[in-house]
């Protein structure tokens, strides 16, 4: 199992380059950063993990592509990923350029985790009907794939449409960086399979249920695509069982704190996950 870390980087936390250098020093495979453009102060949407007040770091996080660029510049081997990019609320032409540029400057180390978003008010503030957010996500992925793989790209959909365009650079990875669908709902496996995407589920407290979904996904994809698990428990025996079921990567949450506290957690994670 490949092992990575994730962190909410803010204007109050350790810097992106500090965390990235530590992650590489401790021989983690990847660093993942989350994405929110903003958090509406008036909202009805509940976070999947926090029923009450949203943690402070959600309000103050850095732009994911800027922070990942800093991480890439500070490292040589570490894979860098969005965990996840809320693509339903990002312009596909602009985001295609950002992804291709980041993959290019990182020498092909970028992993593109995407999702439709849980915060319905946040999505709505970008002019998207929250009920359409997954349909929008699908069209934006398809449009971006066209931009990445065609010298002269065009796309015609219900939510995304543009005439022939030029856009360089192309991603360094061929045909483009791996796309991982971040989703946990009843249709998550079906949607990942339909998109031809790797699956990036959040951890589910019921190991047996999660394993059954992983096996379902693996059967549908004939092991051609991977499963990356977001923020599972730091329990070696449970991680080994999940690895046996088909999880080939997991990443663990670091505290939004200064670098000394971050390093303490990195050391703990490295110790428990060694040789998985």
Where on the chain are the PLM-derived regions?
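Active-site-adjacent structural elements that line small-molecule/cofactor binding pockets in enzymes
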Residues: 1-276
